[in-house]
Amino acid sequence: MTAHTIDGLALSRQLRSALAQRAAALTARGHQPGLAVILVGEDPASAIYVRNKIRACQDNGLRSVLEKYTANLSQAALLERIAALNADPGVHGILVQMPLPKHIDPHRVTEAIASTKDVDGYSVLSAGALLAGLDGFRPCTPYGCMKLIESTGQAIAGRHAVIVGRSQTVGKPMALLLLQANATVTLCHSATPDLGYHTRQADIVVAAVGRARMLTAEMVKPGAIVIDVGINRQADGKLCGDVDFDRVKQVAGWITPVPGGVGPMTITMLLVNTMQATERSAANP
């Protein structure tokens, strides 16, 4: 058996087509969706991520504002810029690209973003809303993972989902989203003994630890849905995920590739959140 590849690029194109129509309708009413992206420093990977986000906005009818600063920007100056963007009615979403230089506290920065514009979904308020099952912005990567799982057409309710990784940005919110979908969830991490024992029981596995090919075929239940969040650069410069794709696809039922799986969906869900923020703003001028 060879797994079905879950094509994140194809699903993204489908969702972005609908988003572009929503953006056009809002723009016609005088509410063009606007996303502000702040990049501090010269990290090459961050520059690529930001470029992809800006391009996605431009391709789908959203206005983008890119503010680039050198790594010696002070925390106070960054917070001032966020305050100005909070007050800008033409900006509906604000994203500060992580990681930040060491002298800047990422928590302070995240909490400085207005809750109505927290389209990354990382603030304490957004996290609390997710925990309580209330409406709010969902963190883009786990939100995209849920869409990828749903695209398989397989039931989530009643299934056993195992998440490998407990980060604030992926692992923990992923667990909450799966719980909301009525899955039974196990959250594994670096201190979990015999990781394979848990993953072999899973109908759904989400790998998000940043360790190249750590999830092997022997660790996967036949027919499982495998979502690979990892992005690791190999010695030859090529990218690979946290899943041993070539071998695991011989066991799994569905699997996401790297690249072309979770990455495009993360950006798409950022656009979804920005659209949601714009529609709320238009409804409550």
Swiss-Prot record:
<keyword id="KW-0368">Histidine biosynthesis</keyword>
<dbReference type="GO" id="GO:0004477">
    <property type="term" value="F:methenyltetrahydrofolate cyclohydrolase activity"/>
</dbReference>
<dbReference type="GO" id="GO:0035999">
    <property type="term" value="P:tetrahydrofolate interconversion"/>
</dbReference>
<dbReference type="GO" id="GO:0006164">
    <property type="term" value="P:purine nucleotide biosynthetic process"/>
</dbReference>
<dbReference type="GO" id="GO:0009086">
    <property type="term" value="P:methionine biosynthetic process"/>
</dbReference>
<dbReference type="GO" id="GO:0005829">
    <property type="term" value="C:cytosol"/>
</dbReference>
<feature type="binding site">
    <location>
        <position position="231"/>
    </location>
    <ligand>
        <name>NADP(+)</name>
    </ligand>
</feature>
<dbReference type="InterPro" id="IPR020631">
    <property type="entry name" value="THF_DH/CycHdrlase_NAD-bd_dom"/>
</dbReference>
<keyword id="KW-0486">Methionine biosynthesis</keyword>
<dbReference type="Pfam" id="PF02882">
    <property type="entry name" value="THF_DHG_CYH_C"/>
</dbReference>
<comment type="subunit">
    <text>Homodimer.</text>
</comment>
<dbReference type="InterPro" id="IPR020867">
    <property type="entry name" value="THF_DH/CycHdrlase_CS"/>
</dbReference>
<dbReference type="InterPro" id="IPR046346">
    <property type="entry name" value="Aminoacid_DH-like_N_sf"/>
</dbReference>
<comment type="function">
    <text>Catalyzes the oxidation of 5,10-methylenetetrahydrofolate to 5,10-methenyltetrahydrofolate and then the hydrolysis of 5,10-methenyltetrahydrofolate to 10-formyltetrahydrofolate.</text>
</comment>
<feature type="binding site">
    <location>
        <position position="190"/>
    </location>
    <ligand>
        <name>NADP(+)</name>
    </ligand>
</feature>
<keyword id="KW-0554">One-carbon metabolism</keyword>
<dbReference type="InterPro" id="IPR036291">
    <property type="entry name" value="NAD(P)-bd_dom_sf"/>
</dbReference>
<feature type="binding site">
    <location>
        <begin position="165"/>
        <end position="167"/>
    </location>
    <ligand>
        <name>NADP(+)</name>
    </ligand>
</feature>
<keyword id="KW-0028">Amino-acid biosynthesis</keyword>
<keyword id="KW-0560">Oxidoreductase</keyword>
<dbReference type="GO" id="GO:0004488">
    <property type="term" value="F:methylenetetrahydrofolate dehydrogenase (NADP+) activity"/>
</dbReference>
<dbReference type="InterPro" id="IPR020630">
    <property type="entry name" value="THF_DH/CycHdrlase_cat_dom"/>
</dbReference>
<keyword id="KW-0658">Purine biosynthesis</keyword>
<keyword id="KW-0521">NADP</keyword>
<keyword id="KW-0511">Multifunctional enzyme</keyword>
<dbReference type="Pfam" id="PF00763">
    <property type="entry name" value="THF_DHG_CYH"/>
</dbReference>
<comment type="similarity">
    <text>Belongs to the tetrahydrofolate dehydrogenase/cyclohydrolase family.</text>
</comment>
<dbReference type="InterPro" id="IPR000672">
    <property type="entry name" value="THF_DH/CycHdrlase"/>
</dbReference>
<comment type="pathway">
    <text>One-carbon metabolism; tetrahydrofolate interconversion.</text>
</comment>
<keyword id="KW-0378">Hydrolase</keyword>
<dbReference type="GO" id="GO:0000105">
    <property type="term" value="P:L-histidine biosynthetic process"/>
</dbReference>
<protein>
    <recommendedName>
        <fullName>Bifunctional protein FolD</fullName>
        <ecNumber>1.5.1.5</ecNumber>
        <ecNumber>3.5.4.9</ecNumber>
    </recommendedName>
</protein>
